[in-house]
């Protein structure tokens, strides 16, 4: 099994935090049992993927709920809402702890996108002024943050640039829980890469480079054991890939014909096993973003390692 570019980033980033991260003091989040949720973290993490070259950001070292991640991005940018019941109807259930008491997450995320009509303005800007440098969607609106309580947006800014036939996008995230959401090949990268694919399709471009910048990325203290498990899995994946590429120690063949057949079969198997995951949008070019459905997406060649890992959240 070949590791994806995201897997390689994840291994490097985990090692960096474990070796160089600093522990916070008096953290705001708490675990369900009331214990302060401490983290170790580093600042200014950057990752880059070229979707046009098959570098889709998804981790194979553990299973990612990629379809649910795309459903969440729909509730923010396609059918924007902050109402928990509407989010849950889309299968997005992890926002319940951030209910501000009125069945919403406050004037945040989808509510901000809807209030300022961010998606339609972005698409119009791309179509009318493709090489302009002002194509930005910002969820960080001070008026909204003051209006209601609620979790301040973590992934809050996207910047869009046209490059020939490609549409590139940079996503800025102020804070990221590496192993549950923001890390390489995690939910945040999957869903924003999907958003890039959607906006590119809606404007007639091909999805190009996706860059992810996290100002502060953390590993929670109760996630450290799982961090080491992911490093162990990476070693297993690397060893498996190396073994698949090495020549057989002994080959028994009765003649050239059967040997040639075996070699061809092995090559085909190796080619299949090395195929990397890719998110495919089954929609014709220049379709309206409102016409895209979650079911139009397909993840190909995705075989993550098992068993699934569980992570306790700091709220």
Describe the role of every protein-language-model region.
Residues 1-246, 260, 266-315:
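Terminal, non-catalytic protein-protein interaction segments that mediate quaternary/complex assembly
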């Amino acid at each position: 099994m070949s590791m994806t570019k995201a897997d390689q980033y994840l291994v490097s980033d985990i090692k960096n935090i474990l070796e160089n991260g600093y522990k916070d003091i008096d953290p705001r989040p708490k675990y369900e049992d009331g214990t302060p949720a401490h983290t170790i973290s580093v600042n200014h993490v950057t990752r880059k993927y070229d979707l046009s070259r098959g570098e889709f950001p998804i981790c194979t070292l553990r299973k990612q709920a990629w379809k649910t991640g795309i459903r969440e991005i729909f509730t923010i940018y396609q059918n924007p809402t902050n109402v928990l019941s509407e989010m849950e109807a889309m299968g997005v259930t992890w926002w319940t702890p951030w209910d501000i008491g009125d069945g919403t997450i406050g004037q945040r995320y989808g509510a901000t996108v809807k209030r300022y009509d961010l998606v339609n303005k972005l698409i119009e800007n791309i179509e009318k002024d493709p090489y302009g440098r002002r194509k930005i969607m910002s969820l960080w609106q001070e008026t909204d943050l003051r209006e209601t309580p609620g979790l301040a947006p973590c992934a809050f800014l996207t910047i869009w640039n046209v490059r020939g036939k490609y549409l590139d996008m940079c996503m800025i995230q102020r804070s990221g829980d590496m192993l549950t959401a923001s890390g390489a090949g995690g939910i945040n990268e999957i869903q924003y890469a999907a958003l890039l694919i959607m906006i590119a399709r809606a404007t007639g471009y091909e999805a190009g480079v996706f860059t992810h910048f996290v100002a502060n990325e953390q590993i929670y203290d109760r996630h450290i054991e799982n961090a080491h498990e992911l490093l162990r899995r990476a070693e297993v994946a690397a060893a498996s890939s190396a073994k698949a590429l090495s020549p057989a120690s002994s080959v028994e063949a009765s003649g050239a014909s059967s040997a040639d057949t075996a070699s061809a079969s092995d090559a085909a198997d190796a080619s299949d096993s090395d195929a990397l995951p890719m998110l495919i949008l089954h929609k014709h070019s220049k379709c309206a973003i409102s016409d895209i459905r979650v079911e139009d997406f397909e993840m190909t060649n995705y075989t993550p390692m098992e068993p699934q890992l569980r992570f306790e959240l700091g709220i």
